[in-house]
């Protein structure tokens, strides 16, 4: 018995396989699913990073409040509470500003302002510059919208765009 030529069965009919049209349809379905899943996954990852930054800021805030309880004032630098080299989930240093002494050594920005040009906090400012790694003093600036900020002396902690 001789083998059948390539692509043909012994009866002269074609072997079952995938046509070019079927392959194009499969590729289109996979591309559509990827187009839906990748942005959803990116949003999930960003929300996870925001939650981690909020947790980090609460932890640093707790350490700063303990320091203030012992010394009667807040430190001028996060390294005084052992958090000077702590980075946010996007790889940037957390920003700290002591509003009482108007000082910020190391990784610190200036005082932050809300959309009505009022100071965010009266004790200290502590925030992450967010996903873009940029920030401006006013929360409604484009560079500040993704910042994770502490406001109202700790009563608010979340995205600057939602403050």
Label every PLM stretch briefly.
Residues 15, 52, 118-121:
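A generic fold-level signal
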Residues 2-6, 62, 102-163:
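Short, surface-exposed interaction loops/tails
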Residues 14-45:
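N-terminal single-pass transmembrane signal-anchor helix
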Residues 1-16:
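N-terminal leader/signal peptides at the extreme start of proteins
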Residues 59-116, 120-122, 163:
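Extracellular/periplasmic head regions of type IV pilus-like filament subunits
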Residues 40-57:
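Aliphatic-rich helix starts adjacent to a transmembrane/signal segment
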Residues 15, 89, 131:
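Short, ordered coil/turn segments that flank beta-strands lining enzyme active or ligand-binding pockets
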